C-alpha cells in the first residue's frame, strides 16, 4: 500500500548519458532559490552503506556478476538509502530529488537482463515498503547518443554498466518505455535528445506543476 508523505518525492530515470544528474543539479538550485527545502540524492548510494554497495555494483572488475546478484544488491542499497535519507527528508516535509529509484531496477535487471519486471518488482516491493515517487521523470535518449556523451565527459568515471553492449542499452531503453506505458499516471517522458535548455524547461514545468497540485 502506498505511503502518505509530508514531503514530495521525485525520481529521475533514464539510460546512461541521459543527463539526469545535470537536470537534478539545476532543478535543485532553482527550487532552493524559491525557498523550497530540497534534498538531492542518488542511487545506488546516498548514504554510507549504500555507497559501499555501489562500489561493488559498478566496479569494472566484477564483470562476472550474475543478474540476480545485481538486482539484490541494488535492492539492498535502496532499502538502506530509503531509511536513512529519503524517509527522514519526506517526514520533514522536504522535496526529494532522487537520481534513479526502483524503475532503474525494473528496466536494467527486469527487462534488459531478462529477469522479468514482475520478479524484480517483488524484490523491490519488499525493500521499499510502500514508498514510491509522486512523479517520475524519464529522460528518453538514443543509447548511441547517451554513450557518446559519456565518452566525451572526462570528469565521469566509466563504470561496469557503461561497458555493456549497445544491444543491452537498447533493451534498457525498451524497458523504460514499457514502464512509461504501464505507469503513465506516474511517469512523464521527456525527449532528452534535445538541447539542454529545452529539456530543463520541460522538466521544471512538470515538477512545478506537481508541487502546485499537492
From Swiss-Prot:
GO terms under biological process: dTDP biosynthetic process; dTTP biosynthetic process; dUDP biosynthetic process
Function statement: Phosphorylation of dTMP to form dTDP in both de novo and salvage pathways of dTTP synthesis.
Molecular function in Gene Ontology: ATP binding; dTMP kinase activity
Transferase recorded as keyword: yes
UniProtKB keywords: ATP-binding, Kinase, Nucleotide biosynthesis, Nucleotide-binding, Transferase
Organism of this sequence: Geobacillus kaustophilus (strain HTA426)
Entry similarity comment: Belongs to the thymidylate kinase family.
Catalytic EC class: transferase
Stated name of the protein: Thymidylate kinase
Gene from which this protein is expressed: tmk
Family annotation (CDD domains): TMPK (cd01672)
Known catalytic reactions: dTMP + ATP = dTDP + ADP
